[in-house]
Amino acid sequence: MGKKFYITTAIHYVNDLPHIGHMYENVVADVIARHRRRMGDDVWFLTGTDEHGQKIERSAAKEGVEPIELANRVVANHHELWKTLNISHDDFIRTTEARHRVGVLELIRRIQERMPDDIYFGEHSGWYCQSEETFIPENQVKEGKDLDGHPVEWTTEANLFFKLSRYTKPLLEHYRANPSFVYPPTRLNEVVAFVEQGLKDLSISRSSIKWGISFPGYPDHVIYVWMDALTNYISALGFGSGDHKKLDHYWPADMHLVGKDIVRFHAVYWPAFLMSAGLPLPKQVV
């Protein structure tokens, strides 16, 4: 058996049916996975669905159904599409699965245990983009929209925060030491420029929505959808389950294959969470 090779796609939102962008990403990942298998490598190929958050909650309400009903219906479409395209994934993770919830809670527990002041309670006001499920910096908002044209709304919430600002220097050092961490180089340059501006602490809970994983110790808050979603890459390997054989074998991921619109989440937020928890970082975000 050759080298281990763990490849992941981004997990896809279930607020609507799968589209050509989802298909493109999974086909590219499938080609890479098949190639590595033919080379004799020990490949693990993960894909899945992101089923929590405001976007899904609102889409379900618009249809007059529960979020899990909408999720189940759309997930069935994903399974049908990947079967039709003969996508050779080894696992399919849903963020509504119990194994995923366990992994998310374990990540938070490790952060709080290792770096107790990395998570704290505070108030935040800013321009919130429902489409991206994140706050948008003031200089990226024009006439009520972000730079990609998505509408934003002014939001004030008392939430739990992650001390992302602490990781500005460690992240920049990691990029310099690992110049292929983000590929292509143009995307790495964008990430470096973003981080060099200085990172602000990140809101990691929401009290305005109910559809998600409850934050430990704060029953009125659900965990921020991106902290929830990103953890799929380790929860699918059994992180937090007590059986870490697959995690120990395949982690860190060799390649996170993602769309250009979510590079920041994978190249900034995700490695910062992992640094805080004392876990190895993925080798590459493509």
Please tell me what each predicted stretch does.
Residues 63-215:
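Residue patterns forming the tRNA-binding/recognition surfaces of aminoacyl-tRNA synthetases
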Residues 56-62:
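Surface-exposed, active-site-proximal loop segments in enzymatic domains
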Residues 39-42, 85-90, 116-119, 275-281:
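Surface-exposed helix-capping loop/turn segments at secondary-structure junctions
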Residues 31, 55, 77, 106-107, ...:
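Short Gly/charged-rich anion-binding patches and loops
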Residues 49-55:
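Short, charge-patterned binding micro-sites
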Residues 2-7, 50, 73, 77-80:
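Short, composition-biased local secondary-structure segments
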Residues 2-40, 46-47, 99-103, 152-286:
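Structured secondary-structure scaffolds
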